[in-house]
């Protein structure tokens, strides 16, 4: 299943970035992405093999074509699809705030990324999904505090503190911090890359090869 939508702005200079969402099964990676790309909430859960999405967003007077790779749910022993990750410039690590195991898996996934890609300086953000359930009256208990998420984020990324992961919580159902999640990653990418390669001649640098 693939989704694609494009929204234009009055920007005159374009650039392109590929990012990937990585996390355990059923943490809401696809739901988050569909909310961002199509502005709708997908309630049913269908295990993802791999999906690709595209959205054009305005960023600092430019049009950014954001290619979003929604990866299959991971566990301790699964291997990442390195071929699919070719060209990825930023990573969104996802866990559910109502699923402790998905949170505990994050350091394992990050180490797996570093080992398989051979680099730890990729722009990365840590995202706690399903924030609406943690504060609802549906009888669902929050299993991971915001403070725990912030602490974990501080341990992810390269040894250069400027490249440490940023942290945010979001809810696809309530459309809470969804746009902000992807913009936060763009800011992380800009910080690492310098200018985000807005000049056409720099547009294809700094990718995973």
UniProtKB/Swiss-Prot annotation:
One of its GO terms (molecular function) is GDP binding. A motif (Effector region) lies at residues 45-53. It is a peripheral membrane protein. The modification N-acetylmethionine is found at residue 1. Keywords: Acetylation, Cell membrane, GTP-binding, Hydrolase, Lipoprotein, Magnesium, Membrane, Metal-binding, Methylation, Nucleotide-binding, Prenylation. Mg(2+) binds at residues 30, 48. Its EC number is 3.6.5.-. It catalyses: GTP + H2O = GDP + phosphate + H(+). The keyword Cell inner membrane does not apply. A lipid is attached at residue 206 (S-farnesyl cysteine). GTP binds at residues 28-31, 42, 45, 48, 132, 172. It is found in: Cell membrane. Binds GTP and exhibits intrinsic GTPase activity. Involved in the regulation of arginine and lysine uptake. Acts through the CAN1 permease. Interacts with BTN2. Present with 1600 molecules/cell in log phase SD medium. Belongs to the small GTPase superfamily. Rheb family. This is GTP-binding protein RHB1. It comes from Saccharomyces cerevisiae (strain ATCC 204508 / S288c). The lineage of its organism: Eukaryota, Fungi, Dikarya, Ascomycota, Saccharomycotina.
